[in-house]
Amino acid sequence: MRRLPAVAGSFYESDPKKLKMQIEWSFRHNIGPRDIPKQSYEKKKRDNLFFIVPHAGYIYSGPVAAHSYYYLASEGKPDVVIILGPNHTGLGSYVSAWPKGEWETPLGSVKVDEEVLMQLVMESEVIDLEEKSHLYEHSIEVQLPFLQYFFDDNFKIVPIVIMMQTPEIAEFLADAIYKVIQKYSDKDIVVLASSDMNHYDPHEITMKKDEEAIEKIQQLDYRGLYEVVEGKDVTLCGYGPIMVSLILAKKLGKKAYILKHATSGDTSGPKDSVVGYLAARFGS
């Protein structure tokens, strides 16, 4: 079973050489880390287990995403990357995992870790196995070329999209992922929370709204984050994945570190209507 790319040629380059150049541009951009970590398959002790990464077109959010991938790649190759993304399309189940096979991008194919996935489904009360939710969804797909740039096909993924973004669903998912991390302690498992921040306000308003959400992220206050999103018109699309990361970080004694906060107005667009982007890591 193959999941074909849905947004190659629009969100990122469809030509492999141009795509690699686009990723390198993201790292070297003045909004990015301005450096590219060395490619390494070496096993290292990983401190940063969870990351927040944006998921817009690379020309907009790539430089911000590069901050998270800089830390991820610097700590060596993970065995499994659990990627949590919001469901933008409204298709499929409330919480959906792609069941098996491979995901393709212009840089090659990445296999789904079916063993870890099935254990996660067993531990969880909310995950359905189905493809419909994933066919046109971009929030997971756009993360893969960054991972492939550093690790080729030498890692596996567990792709999960979340339509029902409530604290209760986040608790179920976080508890299941926590149990899987404990069970597979011999595997190097990383979790990515794919999310953009506030949408389509002017730059200054977006930065201010985002800061309210970022304050809750730094406090690992997942219910506070939910209240900010629901009560203060902060149009953060992947708050479900972020809530899962906050719960996991607290369970495992990790702290939130903000790596970069910017908007599309900072990277490549006008500032009258922007989208906010955040890169963050959760470590000691």
Swiss-Prot record:
Which InterPro entries has this protein been placed in?
MEMO1_fam (IPR002737)
**Pfam families (UniProt xref):** Memo
Q: Which domain of life is it from?
A: Archaea
Name the SUPFAM superfamilies for this protein.
Answer: LigB-like (SSF53213)
Return the similarity comment.
Answer: Belongs to the MEMO1 family.
The protein's name is MEMO1 family protein SSO0066
What organism does the UniProt record list as the source?
A: Saccharolobus solfataricus (strain ATCC 35092 / DSM 1617 / JCM 11322 / P2) (Sulfolobus solfataricus)
Lineage start: Archaea, Thermoproteota, Thermoprotei, Sulfolobales, Sulfolobaceae
